[in-house]
């Protein structure tokens, strides 16, 4: 046993250039996972909106675990490939596959144990710092109680222990299926130079074009949400196809150019690239996808966090927002004065200074509209609207306007997508002429709705007719009285809202058969900060993780290719190639392909921008200028990191191929 343990430890030590990043990856993944689980298990009431925060953090921990599974398998494949010659020598010297398997078991036990123990220790140490950071981004006072989550420790130990067990089983299976000769040759075996596959390249272009078209053509946020994940899958598939097939085609074209190819700075780099391009293309595509994930996630969550005050203000334009629903339209129009008096009396009983009060009655129904004709259920989701009819007198009173309408005319309120038809019709021939577009007064606003709002201002004497037409659609009609007003001074975030509480008490005391909802800006602001703060925190954490994964892939890619190119450059030096020529050739190779993932990730980000903007509308965030700023800043920061990694890995590659490495 001591022999196997010694050989395993000696193998890790001698291959520290490859094992140290692998161990650090495991430590980082385990610590990040524990931190997310520990934060999700904080005592109830520690964070605002704790229900949504817990869901977000649990989802983030699941995403991190799945990503860790893929990344650790990917990086371990480099280790095994590098160790195959060593295992073959053990086999030639008399060790059987069982002995090699025992060495692998000890290596997995040592590397997995170090990663698990180091990750859990680091996670426990940093979890309090992460908790303080999360509370900071939510604008809360710090709680200095130190907690260790036993459930988080057990979950991290179990799930990541399972990953290392799967990695071990995969390595053992590979050894069992290989012969000593195969193991000896496997390190030197590169990819066969594939032929340029124009069909796959064309498929990649078509998929990417289709995804980009979806991104720029979809207008409605709900439609964008429906198609978002399909577009993501199309972009991922297209990126892999283009890098694998397109890069081969590029190298073949370069080889056909004698002026470029037969220069000593290009000859070695291009010929080695085309020899390994299938694997190289997949690695570059992975880097591009990870970079795009980082850019989209970082820009969107940062925009949400810094726009956290805009969102509740969009969702709740007034400090207090009251909605009362009636089943019967006649009851609504009879009782609205009493409702107004009840709300005003309740608010003033708490010393409220009511400002900018707006109230109106409405009838609303979920319909579809196409070419100016309203229809019931069954239409396309892109045609879905929440149609609302408001009496002209209510609109004028709420907005301080003096609009007039003749019979058969309506105004349409401005919305997310302005209504462009000249008429508004119902099945059966009933139609109204659109006199013009006016400002929206709905207390929730069009921006607060998942589907598009279509609000019509109707003559008072015709509101009953339109209500009956809506009822005939058989989709249900919601009849309500809405009231919103601001306060002279809003309550503090942690003090509750006595005005909202008084209004609820007043409405509960009524004997009417009504439903009501009282929404307070001050009461709900904490939920916004909780949700957006946790999303921002999770976005930062996962962005760091994905960025480190991209760095790790780049590092292993460069190191492994450096070892493979070592013999080629050694031959070139023997026939007269200088170190300066080697450096020039390396720069040519790296510059040729290294920045392609960054450029394509930037292109993906540009076309993803409309998609992200539409999705942020579902979070009540309309600040396009802020999103542009966070997107540009995210790309700039990632580009700087990418360039630094390029310089570091090119230096490591150069030392391996020029100095003989550490074979």
Map each language-model feature to its residues.
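Hydrophobic alpha-helical transmembrane segments
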Residues: 19-23, 58, 153-158, 198-202, ...
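Short helix-loop junctions at transmembrane helix boundaries
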Residues: 38-50, 120-152, 209-226, 597-660
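Hydrophobic alpha-helical segments
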Residues: 110-254
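Short cytosolic juxtamembrane segments of multi-pass membrane proteins
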Residues: 1-6, 177-191, 563-564, 654-663
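N-terminal Sec/SRP start-transfer signal
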Residues: 1-30, 193-198, 207, 242-291, ...
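Basic-flanked hydrophobic alpha-helices used for secretion and membrane insertion
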Residues: 311-548
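Hydrophobic alpha-helical transmembrane segments of multi-pass inner-membrane transport and secretion
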Residues: 17-45, 52-88, 108-122, 236, ...
